[in-house]
């Protein structure tokens, strides 16, 4: 469906979530909102005031009683005329209302993210705010909520807009020197000041890119991998961290052959902990696959917990162990000796050391992410476009043997890359990808 055709339709959808529920909210947007209101509830409510109404079918049969609200454009979420129906959240009730609305000429069910896409198309928000809203809806931890709300509040947009304006001003100075070099009111060698300001801007963007790793960890979670020899207590530790039995515990070595993952919320930070197959030499083809997966997951981990039975320690090859490693001695209840070779001593039988380990896992997660107070890039597409921006700025600064016209073009390209982040420039090809992340009704 073309963008132009879809904007001519009036769209509607359940926006309040899965049925049944106590209350259901149906959202409507488009040129026929007033017609829908008159058809379903008999009149158009006073803008922004809830009106208690009887919802009727096209034939006048009652459907339910509830609230109707009207938000005339352009001062609405989408910038168009919008309305909401608040009714009882019974499945049959909502389906009947949606069915009746779908029979009205020019009205159809909204596609995923279509309300937000219309808000973007009508200038009510930029792409970073839309992405922030998507992250806010998907947030599962307090840290994710805070980060998403920050982005949805426009902090990224303000920063990228300011950088883009600085680039445009710098380019204007260069083009003024090109066009009016003979005029007395244009300072000579103004371009030297421009290159200094661009060097500062480049440094700011590079620092901003570096902060993206912390945002990525908060958005996508930290990954902790439990490794060790068979029967080192890996599955027992996973069960403790999960607070339930997710892994089979057995005296038989090699019980765990696939990756088992649980998600923890540690101080508002999502942490994924993975139990892996015991690392050893084996003739079992299935177990070998599990060991290969364990080693691959280790390579991508933010932290590795290397477990060793303190009564029977079996070393794991050092070239398999990443830098971020905690060496944990297990079955401390069977070993009274203290040894400095282990970062922690734990016993899943008596609970020794487990609470301290969990506390330190949370401290580690908080140290990795830190306090995110300033705007940070939250998507890989932001990082890619920011890197392209830096590349063009660098070419402009260091192209001392090139004509000013070419260096000004590098600055124009840098400005365009920044504009693509916010959606101000040439982003049609990525809109479907971004807005498909929303659910129906958003």
Curated annotation (Swiss-Prot):
The keyword GTP-binding applies. InterPro entries: G_TrmE (IPR031168), GTP-bd (IPR006073), GTP-bd_TrmE_N (IPR018948), GTPase_MnmE (IPR004520), MnmE_dom2 (IPR027368), MnmE_helical (IPR025867), P-loop_NTPase (IPR027417), Small_GTP-bd (IPR005225). Its cofactor is K(+). Disulfide bonds: none annotated. Binds 1 potassium ion per subunit. PROSITE patterns: G_TRME. This is tRNA modification GTPase MnmE. The lineage of its organism: Bacteria, Pseudomonadati, Pseudomonadota, Alphaproteobacteria, Hyphomicrobiales.
